[in-house]
Amino acid sequence: MNRKDLGELIIDIHKRKPSYGYHRIWKIIVEETGWVISANLVHKVCKILNIKSKAKHYKYKKPGEESVKYENIIGYNWNTSRPFEKVVSDTTSFWFKKKKSDWTFYLDVFNNEIVGSDVRETMYGNGILNHKKAVENMLNNKIKRGYKDQETIVHTDQGIIYSSVSFNNIFNSYKVTRSMSRAGTPTDNPVIESKNGWIKKEMYIDFDINNYNTVQEFINDIIWDNNNYRPSYALKYKTPIEYRTQLGFN
């Protein structure tokens, strides 16, 4: 391996994943080639080639007042020791072939893995069926992977659906405890806010949305990419599934 070969590979990965910074590019190079190189060398070559991530960090708003709907039992403690210990959720809206869609997804705090999801025509974040299918998908995955009898904290904002009695009744037959951010306080749920911000940018930077026939195919690729391909800084540049399987978890 010489710097010319390295530079060509960096350019190729940058074309595929324009949002990736040098750490993620380094991880992909190591995974795809087996080369023993440092992230610092990749950083130097990126600087020479003037290659930079096209994504920017997500900014948070200031905290608001305390909510009375569900107590924020997580507080600032986002530490976890296993999958499905703490799960967060949000809905993001985006345009697909001139139609707006709502994507509700559930993220496992343990390894940033998307463990539940549903996408359909927009109801401006208030689609009852969209939320119902997404949470059922998450709960089914929890059972399928062997965590049925393990307690799960599901943390969300105070959106209309997340606060509704009918939505929360879904959890009655499961070992789930609800937790909510304070009203108007995205900093109470930094994990999902950060992921949502990155996903919204990466879905347009790293994916050619016009190449997909359906919005479901598009979302399926984003989920696969997040869980199986995208190295995560918080996981020491391992992918979510790589991280949990190496620790021996289903």
PLM features: residue spans?
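Conserved, non-catalytic sequence blocks in retroelement Pol enzymes and Pol-derived host proteins
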Residues: 18-19, 34, 79, 157-158, ...
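An active-site-proximal beta-strand-loop segment
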Residues: 76, 80-126
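Basic, flexible linker segments flanking DNA-binding modules
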Residues: 1-82, 185, 239-247
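RNase H-like two-metal-ion nuclease catalytic core shared by retroviral integrases
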Residues: 63-65, 156-158, 164-165, 178-201, ...
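C-terminal domain-tail junction helix/linker
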Residues: 168, 172-176, 198-250
